[in-house]
């Protein structure tokens, strides 16, 4: 490098990870306008600057694993995130925002009994007399538990991934369950929510109590992602705003055969990546066993039934059976399980 050379420093984000690229140009290779130069900040050698990095896993921040029942969608997720902190919930028709995010709930606590003069009452042995009393406390549910855990990791130079796993996402009314959290699903190139949302006063108070003392090492870089010079990290710590960090993964499963329960609208779908889990032989050697000693290969049965579904009048991919549709013990699927689960499903939902 010689005097007069030009060095171009370019910052970019790839899969949520901030990277820097240096490009060198000779004096005659590029023209640089004086207006391009701006002194941003003088950084002392003693100051440490952390890039927006995080330990990554293979897969997008938000994705739905879908396929026929029994294809191993939950098993696939477990294998991918087993070593990381994860929080699991299952949607159903009665799931609502409070059950997913959190709300005030009555709980029973033991408290001292006070006399008329305001002193604690004691029994004959001198022990304080206690009574049960109903109080209301804000109870965090799966979303807030994962949210807080992910921001706690942001206190480290390389935050570890935190997973929020939603089983059977289409069995619940997603619009009702997510509410305004829906807006947080829009992520920028760095993996943080594009549009922070304002938390209600009750939630803000509880989040401030938990997040207020967190030391976010990448606060300056995170704030730089947002226009207007706002200290969004301070807003997150105060609880006034909600913002998904780039290490919070939200993965869900969906049985395509159940998609008619609560249809997912197109706006919600666009905010997710979709991963199809196809039907395949898991090579476990499962066998259907009967009391008379007869045994039948499970995969051969599945293949024959799925071929009938595909080639017959049904012709619906989502009605097929996956390898893990029936639970096997010691590699055997009992006659009772086969009749009560497999044949019942085929009779009731397929044929």
Language-model region placement:
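C-terminal regulatory/interaction module of P-loop NTP-utilizing enzymes
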Residues: 5, 11-17, 21-351
């Amino acid at each position: 490098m010689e005097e007069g050379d030009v060095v171009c420093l370019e910052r970019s984000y790839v899969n949520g990870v901030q990277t820097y690229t240096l490009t060198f140009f000779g004096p005659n290779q590029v023209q640089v306008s004086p207006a391009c130069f701006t002194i941003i900040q003088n950084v002392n050698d003693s100051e440490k600057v952390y890039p927006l990095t995080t330990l990554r896993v293979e897969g997008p921040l938000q994705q739905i694993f879908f396929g026929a029942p029994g294809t191993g969608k939950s098993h696939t997720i477990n294998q991918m995130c087993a070593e990381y902190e994860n929080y699991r919930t299952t949607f159903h028709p009665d799931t609502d925002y409070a059950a997913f995010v959190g709300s005030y709930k009555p709980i029973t606590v033991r408290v001292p009994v006070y006399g008329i003069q305001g002193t604690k009452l004691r029994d004959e042995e001198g022990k304080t007399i206690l009574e049960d009393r109903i109080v209301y406390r804000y109870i965090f549910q799966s979303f807030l538990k994962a949210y807080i855990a992910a921001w706690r990791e942001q206190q480290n130079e390389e935050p570890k991934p935190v997973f929020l796993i939603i089983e059977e996402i289409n069995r619940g009314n997603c619009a009702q369950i997510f509410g305004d959290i829906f807006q947080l699903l829009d992520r920028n190139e760095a993996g943080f929510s594009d549009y922070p949302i304002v938390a209600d006063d009750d939630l803000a108070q509880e989040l401030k109590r938990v997040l207020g003392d967190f030391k976010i090492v990448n606060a300056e870089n995170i704030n730089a992602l947002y226009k207007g010079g706002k200290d969004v990290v301070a807003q997150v710590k105060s609880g006034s705003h909600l913002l998904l960090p780039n290490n919070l993964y939200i993965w869900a499963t969906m049985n395509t055969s159940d998609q008619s329960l609560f249809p997912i609208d197109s706006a919600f779908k666009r905010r997710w990546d979709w991963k199809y889990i196809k039907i395949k032989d898991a090579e476990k050697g499962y066998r259907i066993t009967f009391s008379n000693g007869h045994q039948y290969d499970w995969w051969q049965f599945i293949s024959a039934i799925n071929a009938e579904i595909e080639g017959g009048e049904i012709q619906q991919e989502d009605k097929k059976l996956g390898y893990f549709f029936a639970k096997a013990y010691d590699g055997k699927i009992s006659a009772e399980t086969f009749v009560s689960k497999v044949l019942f499903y085929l009779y009731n939902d397929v044929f």
